């Protein structure tokens, strides 16, 4: 980087352009190789996992699990099988539902570039880390939902595991309202995201948010918000730049926790006004968490999703003297000061926050360097889809903050219930999809960009170690991760449609009726003589 600083600025831009072009010309550059087997596109037949502790969200038992044609057939002790069955010995290990990541951005156009992980490399990383399904955010094309959906369907053709879609809403008119109906009724989308940040691009105003909340409620779809005050963030960025602070630390300084807390509170109150369930994505601060806690205590239906970066990191990396190191930590909302992480862990342990995502949105160091000299141009996003299951085990289970059954709930089951795909996903029960992991609580892991499966050349969790390692991943009845080897095939993943009206909508109609009955209006008055 020192040599870059001595170069004339136009040459720096030219060098960056050349590097970026080279990166896009070689789509597999920097990606750990995996074995590809065309026969893996169909279910690999019969599997018996024996002698493990089978863990669901509310129960664990020592039992065998028999899988056939991609489905769990039986869960009980001492299952006898023939020689044509692959047997996995899970003695002393946990057999759990594969992780479900509710928050990812694969191959997303953002801030003048495209996230470096696509539906092949990002999902490969997920499987190596024990996640067997994710839900990605579709970004409309010029506000058009159908065009955005078609684009993501095309991107996802290379999928190697199951996935679903959320849909972002970036503008409002009658056409968008009609398209939301289409997305829910025909395309299997039951959640819509509203950005309260990114002024001038994705950001919506309160009027649009209100209309969106009303529409979501009528469709039985869950409204989601990226909660930061976008107007104040823009002012904060201007203020920090005027102070001469242009490096990655300026990103955190320009969008402090109070702006996340304010937007979270505003979204919660507007959702209360409409009586619609609300899902707050990537809760990164005490300020936002406390607003969610107050709302839930009052009985409001609010879901809080922390992400693994906010639970396990602090903002100190943003002050690193090396630009590449500091820039890799830039995401929004920002990673916060030490103390916020522990508070979020405690909120997750006590049920204030319900499930863990990643906001996996990766850019390589070349892409991050677009913001050298102006933090506002650093593409926002970090990795996490491969690291989530390991880091949450180490941070929450090894520390005895939560139980093993809680771990299954926050990494898999709760997500499946919120998005209405339980018990097909998020459980090991007869008839459930055979998306299963075997985790060895005594094995250790170490995280490094040199060994991960993401295409990114950096890793925000670099050097982190711990106990609790996923040794086997089964996706759709296929063993795709075993003995440190991936065996995947492009196109083997399935799109999972998610029906509307999850449990979060139970009792909504009754609450509305009670509200109307409480108004004692209109009052019938006699005409007065004037």
Annotate each PLM feature.
Residues 7-25:
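Cleavable N-terminal signal peptides of Sec/SRP-targeted secreted and luminal proteins
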Residues 96, 146-161, 210-225, 387:
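Alpha-helix-loop-beta-strand connector modules within alpha/beta enzyme cores
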């Amino acid at each position: 980087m020192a040599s870059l600083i001595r170069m004339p600025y136009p040459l720096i831009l030219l060098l960056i352009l050349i590097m970026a072009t080279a990166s896009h010309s070689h789509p597999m550059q920097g990606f750990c190789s995996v074995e590809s087997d065309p026969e893996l596109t169909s279910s690999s037949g019969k599997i018996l996992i024996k002698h493990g502790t089978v863990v669901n969200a509310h129960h664990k038992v020592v039992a065998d699990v028999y899988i056939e044609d991609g489905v769990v057939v039986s869960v009980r002790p001492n299952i006898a099988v023939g020689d044509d069955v692959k047997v996995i010995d899970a003695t002393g290990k946990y057999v759990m539902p594969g992780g479900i990541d509710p928050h990812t951005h694969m191959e997303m156009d953002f801030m003048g570039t495209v996230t470096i992980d696509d539906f092949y490399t990002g999902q490969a990383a997920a499987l190596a880390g024990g996640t067997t399904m994710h839900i990605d955010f579709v970004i409309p094309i010029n506000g058009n939902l159908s065009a955005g959906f078609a684009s993501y369907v095309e991107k996802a053709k290379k999928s190697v595991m199951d996935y679903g879609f959320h849909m972002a809403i970036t503008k409002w008119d009658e056409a968008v309202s009609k398209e939301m109906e289409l997305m829910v009724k025909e395309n299997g989308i039951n959640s819509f995201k509203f950005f309260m940040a990114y002024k001038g691009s994705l950001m919506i105003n309160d009027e649009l948010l209100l209309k969106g909340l009303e529409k979501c409620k009528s469709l039985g779809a869950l409204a989601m918000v990226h909660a930061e005050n976008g107007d104040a963030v823009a002012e904060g960025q201007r203020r920090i730049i005027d102070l001469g602070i242009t490096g990655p630390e300026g990103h955190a300084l320009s969008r402090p926790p109070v702006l996340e807390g304010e937007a979270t509170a505003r979204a919660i109150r507007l959702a209360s006004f409409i009586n619609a369930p609300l899902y707050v994505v990537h809760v990164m601060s005490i300020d936002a968490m406390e607003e969610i806690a107050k709302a839930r205590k009052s009985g409001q239906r609010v879901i809080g999703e922390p992400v693994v970066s906010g639970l396990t990191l602090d903002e100190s990396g943003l002050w690193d003297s090396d630009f590449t190191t500091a820039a890799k930590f830039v995401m929004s909302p920002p990673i916060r000061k030490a103390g916020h992480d522990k508070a979020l862990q405690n909120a997750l342990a006590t049920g204030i926050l319900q499930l863990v995502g990643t906001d996996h949105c990766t850019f390589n160091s070349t892409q991050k360097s677009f913001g050298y000299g102006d933090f506002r141009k650093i593409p926002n996003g970090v990795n996490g889809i491969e690291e989530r299951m390991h880091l949450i085990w180490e941070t929450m289970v090894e520390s005895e903050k939560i139980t093993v059954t809680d771990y299954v709930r926050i990494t898999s089951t709760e997500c499946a219930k919120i998005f209405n795909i339980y018990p097909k996903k998020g459980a090991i029960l007869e008839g459930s999809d055979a998306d299963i992991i075997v985790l060895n609580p005594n094995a250790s892991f170490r995280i490094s960009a040199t060994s991960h499966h993401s295409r990114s050349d950096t890793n925000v969790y670099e050097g982190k170690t711990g106990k609790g390692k996923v040794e086997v991943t089964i996706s759709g009845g296929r063993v795709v991760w075993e003995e440190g080897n991936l065996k995947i095939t492009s196109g083997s993943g399935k799109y999972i449609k998610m029906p509307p009206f999850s449990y979060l909508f139970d009792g909504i109609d009754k609450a509305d009726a009670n509200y109307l009955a409480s108004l004692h209006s209109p009052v019938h008055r006699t005409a007065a003589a004037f």
